[in-house]
Amino acid sequence: MIQYVKRSCALGLLALASAATLAQQNPKPVDTQPVTSTHIIGAAKLIIGDVKQNQAFYEQMFGMKEVSHYSAKDVYDEPIMGFSEGARLALFSPLAEAPIKKSQFPVALIYTPDFEGVVSRIEAAKHPVTRLPTAQSGTFKIAIARDPSGNAIEIFSRPTGILEVGGSKLIVDDRQKAEDFYAKVFGAKPGQRYNTAAYDEVLMQFGAGPFLALFQPKAEAPLPKSQFPVVAIYTSDFDGVLKRVTEIGLGYRDVKSSSPDTRIIIAKDPAGNSVEIIRRAPAAAAKK
């Protein structure tokens, strides 16, 4: 795991996050990211348990603030967390789905210019966190923390940058199949690759926005997947994306939205990860 984090975070420097926001099921999604590509990673989505406990963790440890909040009675409760800029972190609490076992590997990456301050707060609060030794991290300062629901979060020091969510990380059971899926559906381009005795990973690039890491553990058996999304992707080519998702045949479901100009589907990737795909109207985006 230590070796994985070293390589993955070093790569993260090549995939700096720009502005994005999350949309969720009921209201019209709030889209604040400048248009830089057809498809954009809007948010990393974490499956959590207790909302107040997990929200407090991200507020107190990282200084994140709630920017939106969505819910559906007896189905889910979801605060949307964000920094002043960049992609969002959605804390999704299913109300009728049993807790699932979490991977030992990170599912999101956060950049910080105050690495020592952030990690020290987490240590003082007695939350699980591991600093990588210099022998493993090289010139980088890296730590892995776990939120109250057990999600592993990669913390990467970027002294000249700002606090922001740098990428979403999906655990897959076949990196090549997953890569082919995201390349075909979204035209995502593979960036850095890492293949060791412990894992096989590629970072998929979505324009100037956050990266999407596809991480295949070689010593961790595939774990159960939630029926709910673990990443949200905006697209201005919704019809084209839907056509390609349909052709691949892994299935999708429509999600109702109260806004007539918004359409959302949840598709399955080859690993069984649920992917939220949100229509981003070209005409509306052009007004930004």
Please identify what each model-predicted range represents:
Residues 1-12:
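Bacterial N-terminal signal peptides that target proteins for export
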Residues 14-22:
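Hydrophobic h-region of N-terminal signal peptides that target proteins for export
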Residues 86-90, 100, 150-153, 209-213, ...:
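Short, charged/polar, Gly/Pro-enriched secondary-structure boundary elements
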Residues 35-39, 45-88, 169-212, 263:
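Core segments of cupin and vicinal oxygen chelate
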Residues 59-63, 114, 123-127, 173, ...:
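Sec-exported extracytoplasmic/periplasmic mature domains
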Residues 24-37, 39-50, 69, 79-83, 87, 98-170, 191-195, ...:
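Vicinal oxygen chelate
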